[in-house]
Amino acid sequence: MTQVNRLDGGLIDRSTPLSFTFDGRRYGGFAGDTLASALVANGVRLVGRSFKYHRPRGIISAGSEEPNGLVELRTGARREPNSRVTMTELHDGLVATSQNRFPSLGFDLMAVNDRLSNFLGAGFYYKTFMWPKAFWERVYEPIIRRAAGLGALSGEDDPDVYDRGFR
């Protein structure tokens, strides 16, 4: 396992190598790594896109305040969106997928918003998409929400068992 950015020392257990997947590519790390530290060690710099303009974003901090590294964790039917890469402990077989991109993180078609940024001022959608009124809930709002970049739930049955349920 070649990790160009891996430093000597640290609080990881180098005797326990782990493998994980990020956006369909397999990488390696060690027990005690976070997803962020393993990605940085493997030379992965691009982990997300900005919400409005879809500009490329990388990891800039090591704590829970990290704004750029939101991923979706998958395990069978379970999907956990909006997980922070700096707070996700690495485990063998971890599957993480970046969010807020279409079709891929490296080539995001929504990045055209960056080129149109002069025309997309704050709250532009409240002024622009007012007519016809019936289009707001059925057309405009779903498109804007999809472009906003937060994760989506799986839609499959929750495999967990709970003591109580509320509806």
Segments the model singles out, each with a brief description of its role:
Residues 39:
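Carbohydrate-associated surface elements
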Residues 34-36:
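Short, structural beta-strand-to-alpha-helix junction motif
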Residues 51-167:
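Fe-S ferredoxin-like electron-transfer domains
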Residues 1-18, 22-31, 42-81:
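Ubiquitin-like/PB1-type beta-grasp interaction modules and other compact soluble beta-rich domains
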